[in-house]
Amino acid sequence: MENILLKIKKLILENKIALFLTVYLVINTLFLTKYPFMHSDESWLSGLSRIYLENNSPIITESFFDLFPRFPHSIKIFFHYIQAFFSNIMGYNLFTFRFISLLFGVFTLYIIYKIGQKILKSKVSSFFLMLIVAFDVHFIYTSHFARQEAVILFSIIFAFYFYICKKPSLKKSIILGIITGLNIGIHPNSLFIAAIIGSLYVYDIIFIQKIKAKELLIYIFVTGIFAAVFIAINLYFDSNFFHNYKEFGDQFNVFAQPTDRISEIKNFYLKLYYQVSGTYYIPNIKFQLLFFPLIFALSFIKFIIKKDFSKYRYMGLIIFTILAINITYIIIGRYNQTSIIFIFPFFWMLFIINFKDIKYKNIISLLVAILVLIISIFNIIPFLNNDYKDYIENISKHVDSNEAVLANLNTEYYFSCNNLYDYRNLNYLKENHITFSEYINKNNIEYIVYPEEMDFIYNTRPVWNFIYGNLYYYYEDMQNFLENNCELIYRFDSPYAMRLSMYMYEKNWFVKIYKVNY
């Protein structure tokens, strides 16, 4: 018995990182669909992945948008096929698609541990680096969110690790170009990877002078080939790709003047600090947003004073990476709150590097890890009773999944493919010269799942017009139709009746289910 216990102890000690990551994975699955609240972006993405499978083709658009302008493209094609693969194995539900993000989150933590070993030369310090990132609420949020951020973050961290581990070579530049290029098929945020790798090359070319500029040019060339291929595929999918993509980008000020984009970065960070958002959840990251600038300032001052660019190479590379990410925010101009996670691991790396040579570094790291965990717990606990499953079950009691329905996109995981029509379509009734009632009849819609947020948005217009467009054109027609042509069959309260995150838990919001009378 004693020998068995000794073997178990030895196995645990030898595989403690794998054990930690396994436990981390299991614990996170327990509240994977509860934190954060489900966002319609998640069902939007997985809904298109389901359409890929249904039609055996990526040259398709979302079935829940018939009036809302959508055009086929290949920019997220790999991500959709990753989702389709997992959907075939685990079923079509929120847990499946969030589990993908969680897996990539766990892979990211392992690479962060390996980065720590490379730059810190200490397994203990590397473990604390991984632990702090794992406990960070925004990392947990990203690992629980069925969007592409977790995949892009993994690619960023892996590319950074690959760069610092491999000696300069043609092969290295080509592989980094391939990593960046493949991520174009995940999300346009692959630009962050390009900016980061470019900044690493620039640092080494200028300060270390052991890398030639041609290696950077090779990286740019390989990445450019992938970009050209994706552009060609997009033009094959949609001959008006450039025009349509520009129109889509205009909605998010992607093509705003450079001066406007530069000035907006201040508001970006202020909104994150004060948790100001539209429909996206923003965790309380005030501690990080106050702590990170202090760490950056300390690192930058040390880097400038020491002037030993070789000795402090890793610190310099991380500083350049953080600057590159911020410049990319400005270049893209969209300032999506979810993309802030790309910068977090690098700030935590700076923190660990700055304290790696002091006597009580492990105690300080442990205290910071505990503080970060406490902050995360206080962020997460309020959501543990917020079960998306309850929302869907309330609808399922009165509406069959095979019925045609007008509803919010956050119901998409319940309904069968091609049966859901989203409220975003209604903003295009006017330009299509049809009324609300004609739209319902045209699509043979049997049920209307009506969230109270529609009334709130209408009554506070134009403040929240960006959610569903201007409701003024069809709101009265919709209310008359609900009153005269429908029967109210069920009413229940749910936070999912309000998509605006700042109001979701302010009061009880209600969902009404109407049956259309034909």
Question: Where are each of the predicted segments found?
Answer:
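Extracytosolic helix-loop segments that constitute the early lumenal/periplasmic catalytic or substrate-binding loops
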Residues: 27-31, 43-74, 78-81, 85
